[in-house]
């Protein structure tokens, strides 16, 4: 049981070489996220709480929004570290962030100030671990990325209290890709 509030984070899109919504890797990632979230929802998950980073965080919001018709009580929160989060992004990425923030049940900045110092990012990570009951990361310690800091914070929280940390690793993604390929092949053979 992951509890009622789940922090979802992980790799940035560029760390996985996913560039665009038609990338085949994205379908695998979203399928893996969907399967895991559905399992948690069936166990009583109420809130998905994530950030706005380009990559796993935004993909998790997209997947969660797609699950809301099946789980009408499911809520989604997008928290960002500071008020001007994403302002350095290109116009398309800023628009995507704004659109997703407009579709979730709750969105706010942890620090009610524009970016000033790295301590705001540390405060954000602390906020996420304190205000959730568990963490799900699309992350593999054998392939470090920026989510390493989130992983370390989640593991540190798990050392202090009951705070399950579940990873979707590269091996897990490979298994999902194989299952999807087998299902597609079976479908093709049956047509």
Curated annotation (Swiss-Prot):
Q: Which domain of life is it from?
A: Bacteria
**InterPro entries in the record:** YspA
This chain belongs to which protein, by name? UPF0398 protein LCABL_17010
Q: Which family does it belong to?
A: Belongs to the UPF0398 family.
Q: What is the lineage of its organism?
A: Bacteria, Bacillati, Bacillota, Bacilli, Lactobacillales
């Amino acid at each position: 049981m992951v509890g009622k509030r789940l922090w979802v984070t992980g790799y940035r899109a560029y760390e996985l070489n996913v560039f665009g919504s038609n990338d085949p890797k994205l379908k695998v990632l979203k399928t893996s996220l969907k399967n895991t979230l559905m399992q948690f929802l069936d166990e009583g998950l109420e809130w998905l709480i994530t950030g706005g980073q380009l990559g796993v965080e935004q993909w998790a919001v997209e997947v969660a929004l797609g699950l809301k018709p099946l789980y009408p009580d499911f809520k989604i929160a997008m928290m960002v570290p500071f008020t001007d989060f994403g302002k350095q992004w290109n116009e398309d990425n800023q628009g995507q962030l704004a659109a997703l923030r407009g579709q979730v049940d709750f969105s706010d900045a942890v620090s009610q100030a524009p970016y000033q110092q790295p301590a705001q990012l540390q405060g954000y990570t602390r906020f996420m671990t304190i205000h959730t009951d568990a963490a799900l990361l699309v992350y593999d310690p054998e392939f470090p990325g920026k989510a390493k800091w989130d992983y370390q914070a989640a593991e540190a929280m798990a050392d202090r209290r009951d705070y399950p940390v579940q990873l979707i690793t590269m091996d897990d993604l490979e298994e999902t890709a194989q299952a999807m390929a087998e299902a597609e092949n079976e479908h093709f053979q049956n047509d």
